[in-house]
A protein has these predicted regions:
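Long, Pro/Ser/Thr-rich low-complexity/intrinsically disordered regulatory tracts in eukaryotic proteins
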Residues: 1-158, 173, 187, 192-194, ...
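Conserved phosphate/anionic-ligand binding catalytic regions in large, soluble enzymes, centered on
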Residues: 160-177
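Alpha-helical support elements that line or immediately flank enzyme active sites
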Residues: 177-183
């Protein structure tokens, strides 16, 4: 898989075609697995890691799932290429920043990725556009079963799947949904919502998962622990709360249009104007402005722009993507200039509507 070619494509989860995709960017399920005969990654020697990587590479290739996957040696990539995969949500920051032998296997639609030698020996991830936890679960279950036919997982009859982190012991599952919640941020209700989520043992993280900051009003909601609950119970725990959050966000958007229509229209128009004319712009400012424009498109305030385009720009304007698209490494100053140029070119012809009706 050539990453330069991948930069010009859009993963399925970014297409904005799934259920409730106006607010739910993506649904993801991740399974943590370890190989019975090897020590955990945190206790593994450099040789152990190399042996784990080779073992899993060979076994995955022979599994029923292997033919649909492209194998990438993450340890052999440069910093830009590793960050590129992080920006596409195909690997974690932890895998990108780790040392020693490590890899990822990815399917052509970017729905499935298998990370090798992250916190656990193997982390299987499936991701779909919109709110589709059931579909993601069916897909990842099939991949897990296929790999499990050729890989002896570390499993305890009482405790379940054994993992490096105690919070993952049991099912080893992490269920997460990425939501775009700009209206709750603008109306200052977001902290109240997050406090309620923490009370029911759900975690709130930023765009790139654990330890990352929220950018562009995007948040990941996920379960915190797995022990003592079945996969179905954890899927339901997250699945039950997401429709409530969707309703809160939609009501907040309706309130903004009803009570502060001109102000919202002004915010959206200013954001769109800056994106179309800026000569230099940071990744952080771009994310925030794209967030406002994304909301504006869905409120009918901007024409000739669709959600799939905005979703794509959220990724393609990130530092590594800009460098892959340009074909050269760029320092911060040049990236900001290139980002502005790319946005001007992309939005050429799109016009904000002149009224708030």
């Amino acid at each position: 898989m050539k990453l330069d070619t991948l930069a010009n494509t859009v993963g399925e989860w970014l297409r904005g075609t799934g259920p409730e995709s106006d607010i739910v960017m993506s649904s993801r399920v991740r399974l943590a697995r370890n190989v019975a005969q090897f020590p955990f990654v945190s206790r593994a020697t450099e040789q152990d890691r190399a042996d784990i990587e080779r073992f899993l590479r060979e076994r995955i290739a022979t599994s029923p799932a292997g033919s649909a996957l492209e194998y990438i040696d993450v340890g052999g990539l440069d910093d830009v290429d590793r960050q590129f995969l992080v920006e596409r949500q195909l690997i974690s920051r932890e895998l990108a920043e780790a040392q020693g032998a490590r890899a990822v296997a990815i399917d052509g639609r970017e729905q499935v990725s298998l990370m090798i030698n992250e916190e656990d020996h193997l982390r299987i991830q499936c991701m779909h556009s919109g709110l589709d936890l059931e579909g993601v679960w069916r897909q990842i279950l099939a991949v897990d079963e296929a790999v499990g036919k050729v890989v002896p997982y570390a499993y305890h009859p009482r405790f379940g799947y054994l993992t490096a982190c105690p919070t993952n012991v049991g099912t080893g599952i992490r269920v997460s949904v990425m939501l775009h919640l700009p209206a709750l941020v603008i109306t200052r209700q977001i902290d109240k919502v997050f406090r309620s989520l923490h009370k029911i043992s759900l975690a709130v993280r930023g765009l790139y998962g654990e330890g990352s900051q929220a950018m562009g009003d995007f948040y990941q909601i996920s379960n915190q622990t797995t022990l003592g609950k079945t996969e179905e119970e954890l899927l339901q725990q997250v699945g039950d709360v997401v429709p409530v959050l969707i309703d809160y966000e939609r009501r907040a958007r309706e309130f903004l249009v009803r009570e502060t229509e001109q102000n919202v229209h002004d915010q959206v128009s200013r954001a769109f104007g800056i994106l179309r004319t800026a000569q230099t712009i940071s990744a952080e400012e771009t994310m925030q402005l794209l967030s406002r424009v994304r909301m504006g498109v869905l409120l009918g305030l901007i024409g000739d722009v669709n959600i799939a385009d905005i979703n794509s720009l959220l990724v393609r304007t990130q530092p590594a993507h800009l460098q892959k698209l340009r074909g050269v490494e760029l320092d911060t100053r040049d990236r900001n200039i290139e980002r502005a140029r790319y946005l001007r070119q992309h939005f050429e012809g799109g016009e904000p509507r002149t009224n708030a009706n």
